[in-house]
């Protein structure tokens, strides 16, 4: 079975001085999709998100790392302020961090995040990455 080739891009793929960047000509030619980290929680924006987002010509997904103990509304307002998605973009909520929270708390926060994004974007294709 063949799977589509995609990559994940965040500030970690750039040098600290910004001189080394991903080669978007190669990425756009070889990849079928790209996931780009938009931010984390309610206060961090990946400093290379906009640059990466603007240089992609393949289907793209913006992902946001969720902190389960923080306000879902604040986190999703921050996410949507960064991304401003179109109806062809895909949004992904990254819920890999538990920060010592219970499964119930993590699930509750995720559900609130999904509800907020769906209500404020009309997008029903929001995915969760665990």
What does each model-found stretch correspond to?
Residues 2-123:
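Substrate-binding cleft of extracellular glycoside hydrolase catalytic domains
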């Amino acid at each position: 079975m063949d799977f589509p080739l995609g990559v994940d891009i965040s500030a970690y793929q750039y040098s600290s001085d910004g001189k080394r960047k991903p080669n978007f000509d190669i990425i756009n030619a070889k990849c079928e999709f790209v996931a780009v980290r938009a931010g984390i929680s309610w206060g961090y924006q990946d400093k290379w998100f906009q640059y990466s987002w603007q240089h992609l010509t393949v289907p793209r997904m913006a992902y946001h790392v969720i902190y389960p103990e923080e306000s879902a509304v604040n986190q999703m307002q921050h996410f949507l302020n960064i991304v401003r998605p179109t109806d062809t973009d895909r949004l992904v909520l990254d819920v890999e961090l538990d920060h010592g929270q219970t499964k119930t708390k993590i699930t509750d926060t995720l559900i609130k995040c999904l509800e907020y994004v769906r209500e404020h974007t009309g997008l029903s294709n929001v995915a969760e990455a665990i």
